[in-house]
Amino acid sequence: YEEPKGLANFQKVIAVPQKKAPNPAVPHLTPEMMQILLAQPDRNTVKGRRDMTLMCTLYDSGCRVQELADLKVRDVITGSTAVLVLTGKGGKTRRVPLMKNALSLLQHYVQEQSLDKPWKSDYPLFVNKQHNQLTKEGISYIISCYISPARKVLPAVPEKVTPHMFRHSKAMHLLQAGVSLIYIRDFLGHEDIKTTEIYAKCDTELKRVAIENAYPDLIDSTLPDWSRDASLLEWLSSLK
């Protein structure tokens, strides 16, 4: 760079735009995969009911794993419009609706765990064996325990399922059900709609691949070699 003669070439090199890497696919489960995974905990045991309620809440609310870990008993608001109060990044709170089945699980869980006392409203909603608030790692471990049984039912279930894949799955399922990106943005707590648009891009690509796999392409893209057509060449020459 100290030689003026090489400066022009150096400028050309740094002016070459970087190759844009393709956007990675959003890792998520299909509705069938999610349904099978959520059905794995043993409903006949206290631990199984706790795990099922935890995973169903994670999926139904589309919350981040830390938001799930931070839930307090008071954050489950029942009534005519049942909602879950989530505390996200920067301490910002948002309310997401609870569907009927998820609400029923939470209500039974709160009663079974004796958390329905007024003085327990600030208790952590989900705790470990030591009655301490579950950590992100603890939640990840709980989910991992049910992957192998789920794969025995449906081998297509991924070998690794993370808590964040529950959030991705909920967003994709909402989008595929026709819910607008604006609502999904607010539901997930995104500040920028561009963050939410990754789901739309992923869904479009999945549809394209599905169409390619399902239907033969009937359009023949091969064109005749016009350079061998003498009459066409004569006509083109006459246009000069």
Feature locations, PLM:
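Conserved catalytic core of the tyrosine transesterase superfamily
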Residues: 1-240
